[in-house]
Amino acid sequence: MALDPTKHADWEIAQDAEKDMLTIYEIGEKLGLTKEELLPQGHYIAKIDFRAVLARLKDKPDGKYIDVTAITPTPLGEGKSTSSMGLVQGLGKLGKSVCAAIRQPSGGPTMNIKGSAAGGGLAQCIPLTPFSLGFTGDINAIMNAHNLAMVALTSRMQHERNYTDEQLERLSGMKRIDIDPTRVEMGWIMDFCCQSLRNIIIGIDGVNGKSDGYMMKSKFGIAVSSEVMAILAVAKDLKDMRERMGKIVVAYTKKGKPVTTEDLQVAGAMTAWMVDALNPSLIQTLEGQPVLVHAGPFANIAIGQSSIIADRVGLKLADYHVTESGFGADIGFEKFWNLKCRFSGLKPDCAVIVATIRALKCHGGAPVPVPGKPMPEEYNTESVEWVEKGCANLLHHIRNVRKAGISPVVCINAFYSDTDAEIAKVRELSEAEGARVALSRHWEKGGDGAIEFAETVIEACEEETEFKFLYELDMPLKERIELIAKEVYGADGVDYSNEANASLARIQADPELAKLGMCMVKTHLSLSDNPSLKGVPTGWRLMIREVLTYGGAGFIVPVAGTISLMPGTGSNPAFKRVDVDCETGKVEGVF
């Protein structure tokens, strides 16, 4: 019998369930994989040979495609991964053939505030510790591939400074690129949250001692913000990945010409690091349903999706395939809608919007909960008024999903402190907006608590959809940014820094770059670019401070507000509570 989530930590529940979990071959058989298509990494984890699977099942119709998104979250998160696992377990209880695709957790949040992305309570994926701490090495491969590009760039700059054109040609066959050190687009990456590395100087002794590099400003981002990670999420196959890898813009020349990884002759070696990472990984839920894990970009600072490859595999193997978009529907679902589905050609049958009474109270005026601190008393006291006010945020997201032509299902992710009156108000307002609504207690009861949720999703999947994109790629860049800002976020308009205006003018003038997709970078804690503005802010304008070019991933990246591609570690990080049992080797405290 499963442990009680009101009395036991997530890691305790996971370790207890892991005593009886299915072997990877049993999970593979459940999903319909052959032994040859499984590439085991121990007894309970495997990579999947996606090429073999897709070739074998090329004529099989796809299953139903379900995206799980959420309302604008509090800093604590609203249980989107938990709800994804709960939905899969609920569908399993109904005897449905089901699969999930989720993102690999980053070491940064796992060791910081948010924790892992395995779900929680009785709706988790296992084995928890390897899933949370490095897993099958994909993020490590991404770091190596990305940082190799920076090695190629910085060493090239050093050699061009140290040698004449004739010496470069004689020593290595190089021709001078003449990179502008003030226009290096790329930085270094690591898989932790470290504010000290946001702005750095490298090559400090490289001015007089010419063997120590090229002294210049540089930066670190978190690994999941890397364009290499984005490429893993959107690549269709190895050939597509190799082509995309060569289009990464690392810098510009002094004449303003983009310098790519292909120009630096490093794209092939970068791809070599990524060959194994292109295969999705396979694990299971607490109740033995298959879960694919592939790619891990955040939605606030990146594309925020698990991979297209994982979705294609899941749709061929299962009748119901559940994927997940990061954070709220304004950023994660918007990118699923206008980027991932555009790249993949896949059309969703249903979108789930996860809502909690806690988040609705926060959007309705209750104090914002702070990770690591006691929950304000307002969240343990009934307040239908706060919930009703906060529902404005939920209704905004319902309308956005409807703009995509998809059937929305509101999942009320129940907490034991929620009251019947609060839940009834959410149901009333959501149904009045035309959404289906399900109350789910998967955190507390696992699949048994998600039956209504699963049945509602099945019903929604039978409804005809009229899926359509928000914008076409031939629309001018500024018009697209303003359309997203007004239609999805609710802004009055958009303002641009001088730097952003210059970048957009340069990109718009390039016929190839001007038709790339649009991947907005914005806080996840508000519909606006100001994380302190809750509910549905009015009378505000989106501020674009810079615009990046991700030519390999296939999109332009407008960066809004003050958000950073390298998060910081808080004052009460999760790593303080992680340790090992030296007798058993078991890791404790991961959540």
Curated annotation (Swiss-Prot):
Native species: Desulforapulum autotrophicum (strain ATCC 43914 / DSM 3382 / VKM B-1955 / HRM2) (Desulfobacterium autotrophicum)
Family membership noted in the UniProt record: Belongs to the formate--tetrahydrofolate ligase family.
Any single GO BP term: tetrahydrofolate interconversion
CDD domains, per database record: FTHFS (cd00477)
Annotated residues for binding of ATP: 74-81
Protein name: Formate--tetrahydrofolate ligase
UniProt pathway annotation: One-carbon metabolism; tetrahydrofolate interconversion
Catalysed reaction, written as an equation: (6S)-5,6,7,8-tetrahydrofolate + formate + ATP = (6R)-10-formyltetrahydrofolate + ADP + phosphate
Annotated keywords: ATP-binding, Ligase, Nucleotide-binding, One-carbon metabolism
Molecular-function annotations in GO: ATP binding; formate-tetrahydrofolate ligase activity
InterPro entries in alphabetical order: Formate_THF_ligase (IPR000559), Formate_THF_ligase_CS (IPR020628), P-loop_NTPase (IPR027417)
Enzyme class: ligase
Enzyme Commission no: 6.3.4.3
